[in-house]
Each structure stands twice: as structure tokens, then as C-alpha cells.
Design a protein with these regions (language model features):
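Eukaryote-biased, non-catalytic alpha-solenoid scaffold regions
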Residues: 2-180
């Protein structure tokens, strides 16, 4: 009984999901012996392991969203986008062609979570503006501009439109149309 109580009483509040997600990318990028068992080390990242671990975190984020734990959901979604952007490698271009195993799927999942968070009644205005602020920083990561794995600008526009009053949203759309 104690184990079940202890497990159910533990919350996500004490966990730093941002650090835990970044650790995944850091720990599976270390040198290991190559598969040819020669004296050269293989410094490539084990992407399959990274993405298997990311699956777990994104499932946690879905669960936290269903519980109304917006902070944990936001932390996981934003760190997913940041870590993928900061750790993207050219070899992933070939992996991304596989529909079941690609960075864009993880980015889309994280972006979808953020859209659900923004539309959730428990989400505060401060959380919404914090999301936008961090997305602006993430959008500056060159990976998103150079490789087109995910359109962060589109996500920011959707979030902006959903949190603005109708008049402001129309002004924003007009401004975007003028710049294009």
C-alpha cells in the first residue's frame, strides 16, 4: 500500500524535465567503439535511443496535459523543440525520410502540445506569453531555418492568433500579409 501511495503522491513539480531531456541528447552523443571493432571511435549520436527516450517524455507530456499540469507539459514541449534544434545533425536528413522515425514528427508532437496548452482553460496569460517568448528564441536556432524540419514561425503565428483578441489577431494577419 505504501508503494502505491508514494507513487501516486509524487508529482512532476520536483522534476526538471528540461535538464532531463537535454541529458538524453548529451549522453547518447559520447564516443563509443565502432561497429567494425577497429581502433577508431564512433562519435555519432545513437538517434534511435534518443528518440525512444523522447517518446517517453512526450507521452508524459500528454499525460500531464490530461491532468492539467501545464508547467510540466510546457517544459517538455519547449525543451523537445530546443534540444532537437540544438543537436540536429546532417545524418538525420536521411532518417527524416522515414515517416515513423523522424525529428519532424517529434517537433510536430511538441508543437501540437503547445497549441493544446494555449487553448486549455487552466493556462494563464503569463504562461502563454512565456511560451511565445521562448519560441522566439527557439526560432533563432539555425537548424529550423536551414533544414526546414519544423515551421516554428507558423506555430508562433497560430499561438499568437489564438491568444490575441479578435482585433489584434486581424491586425497581425494584415501585418503578415503586407510583409509577404
Amino acid at each position: 500500500k505504501r508503494f502505491i501511495f508514494k507513487e501516486s503522491s509524487s508529482t512532476s513539480k520536483g522534476k526538471d524535465y528540461r535538464t532531463e531531456i537535454q541529458k538524453i541528447f548529451n549522453s547518447f552523443g559520447d564516443s563509443k567503439k565502432s561497429r567494425y571493432h577497429n581502433r577508431y571511435n564512433d562519435y555519432s549520436r545513437d538517434w534511435e535511443t534518443v528518440f525512444n527516450r523522447m517518446d517517453v517524455f512526450l507521452k508524459k507530456a500528454d499525460f500531464f496535459l490530461s491532468l492539467g499540469d501545464m508547467d510540466s507539459t510546457i517544459a517538455i514541449a519547449l525543451q523537445t523543440l530546443r534540444s532537437i534544434g540544438e543537436n540536429y545533425e546532417d545524418e538525420l536528413l536521411y532518417i527524416d525520410d522515414d515517416d515513423d522515425f523522424g525529428t519532424s514528427l517529434y517537433c510536430e508532437h511538441a508543437g501540437g502540445l503547445l497549441m493544446k496548452v494555449v487553448g486549455h482553460p487552466k493556462t494563464t496569460q503569463k504562461q502563454k506569453t512565456d511560451i511565445l517568448q521562448e519560441l522566439r528564441q527557439i526560432a533563432e536556432i539555425s537548424t529550423y531555418r536551414n533544414y526546414g524540419i519544423y515551421d516554428i514561425d507558423e506555430l508562433m503565428m497560430q499561438i499568437n492568433l489564438s491568444i490575441q483578441p479578435t482585433e489584434k489577431a486581424l491586425e497581425l494577419i494584415d501585418g503578415l500579409l503586407e510583409t509577404r
